[in-house]
Amino acid sequence: MAHLLGSPACMDSLRKDLTDLQGAIVDVFSRAGPVRFPSWKFPDRAACDLDMVALLEHYDHVPGDPEFTQLAHAVLLELVIDRLLLLLQSCASYLENLTLEQIVPPARAAGPCMSVGLTVRRFWNSLLRLGMLSQQAALQKRANQGETLTSKPTAKGEPAGSRELGTAQLVKPPSPVPGLPQACPERDSLPVSVSLRRPGGTAENTRSVHSQTIETALVPCDACTSVQSSLREVGKVVINLCQSQNLPSSLGRFQQLVRDSMGHRPLPAATVGLWAAEQSKDLACLGKLVGLLRAQLEEAEGQKDRLRMQVGELEQALQEEQAARQRQAQEAEQHRAQWERERQQLLAETSDLKTKVATLEGELKQQRESTQAVESKAQQLQAEAEHRLEAERQVQHLEQQVELLAGRLDGASQQIRWASTELDKEKARVDSMVRHQESLQAKQRALLQQLDSLDQEREELRGSLDEAEAQRAHVEEQLQSVQGEREQATTDLRLTISELERELVELRERERLLVAFPDLHRPAEAQIQSSGNVTDDMERQVQANDIRIRVLQEENGRLRSMLSKIREVAQQGGLKLIPEDQLWALRSKGIQGAEPPLQTARTSPGAPGRRHLPGSRPASAGRTLPGQPQASPPLRPHRRPGESSPEDATYLTNCAQSPIRALARLRRRLSPSSGRASPAHQPQERPT
């Protein structure tokens, strides 16, 4: 049987048996009333108070837990024993009620704790007493039937009804069994009724009198049916109220037990009494809940009055708030009028800016070309990236040196291990010498001297080991220092990169400002992207115009200084005027005979002959960026000896065509130091 412990089929069979036993127990309780005996499984609790539904849900088959499943199987077996004992105890109580002919079961106190044998013996004794009583009743019934058949009328004029009544009183049927449905007649009453209807030797003037009793009723009483239906309806209402208020319902559990055991059959008197008791418990619980709800209702009424007062205060505050909002609306109207005036003023300023834009359209093409300066900046950043690669190669070289030092450290470790093995060998020799001490007493002194020498060698080896450890620590310190230098170099490179990227972002932002906001009303073929906010666009346009104005003022200052220098040179006689025909002839000869000019000039982040953006000039004029070499003046093309200078001819031609370019070229020739400082601002010479 051990292999069946925990079997799902066995456990399901036990669960069904427990369900059937519980239904039978409820049926007996409905007829004899609940009996209160201690439980065999749980001695501290009454057997009739056990919640079998909860126990069956808890002790169930669990696939993943065999230990708990076996325990549940054992508990189910014990519960079967417990329910069987309770069934025997309740049946014994029911038999006692039948023996004593008690229709309503009396209230019983809690019974003693009885063993299985005592319970079975008590049940058997009750069953024997009932059997003896039933035999006595059967014998008495047979004797009464014999007397009825052999009896004759004593008087001729005696009515038949009186003899029938006397016979009926003589053969009185046994008392009805309490708890059985009243609609079911006794089987033993049928022959009695036959004997009453067919008396021997009846007179001609006799007549039958029919009487309806509880024992002979074939259908339930209409009043009982109506009362029980009303009781069920009231019970449903009470249970629904308890469920709606989240209250435990004793009547609901009792109704479920009655429905499982009896279905929709008429209830006995004992069950109706228990039904009324459980219903009164639920009604008392609902009465307490109604009292609490009334208290809460009174409290809610008080809160309602307080809320009304708060509503009045809030209405007054709302009126004040509305008045304040009206005042704010008036102030907002005044502000709107002021903003309208400011808008008109801004429109007037916009018209002024349009006139200024007309004067700055000539410089727009040069500003477009200045975007190429960013490309030169990118080339410089690429060169710096190459420098970073060179630094990374140096770091790799340092790492190789660190690996070399690590190899040396491994060699030193191997030497230390060799020394330790030698030391172990010497120790083994010493041990062998000690073992052979008795046989080599003559050589003891020599061995002692050799042992001293070995000790000295051991001390020397220990010293060498300490030196190797010190060298290893020194190598580790060098390795840490090299790693620190590497990390420092990496940090410096990252800082340099971040600084260059930040400068690149600034240059791009300046370029974007000067390219995206030169004018709010550009032609249709060159529309700029607007941010959607006219005020922000106008502020950016004003910023760009301020930058242009500052650049133009600086350019005017340089032009004035160049004019003064030109006038001084002209007064000294250094300038000569050449006719235009000779200039063209000289230029053509110079172009045919001159070698191609060399364009190998080192410049700052803008190509020679290209102008920076007005916003980017402060970054290049008068100072250089970190890591940026100073720009050198552009190299002049070589000339053959004996030829006229094509540069002079070109210079005079450009003077005739563009005075600004001529002044810039003359400034570069007269003041080379200023040309080296800011070559990015020199205008580019165009071939004619």
From Swiss-Prot:
Residues 288-572 form a coiled coil. Residues 671-680 have a biased composition (Low complexity). Keywords: Coiled coil. Residues 143-162, 168-189, 322-341, 366-385, 592-688 are annotated as: Disordered. InterPro entries: CCDC157. It comes from the Eukaryota. Residues 143-153, 369-382 have a biased composition (Polar residues). PANTHER family: COILED-COIL DOMAIN-CONTAINING PROTEIN 157 (PTHR43696:SF9). This is Coiled-coil domain-containing protein 157. It comes from Bos taurus (Bovine).
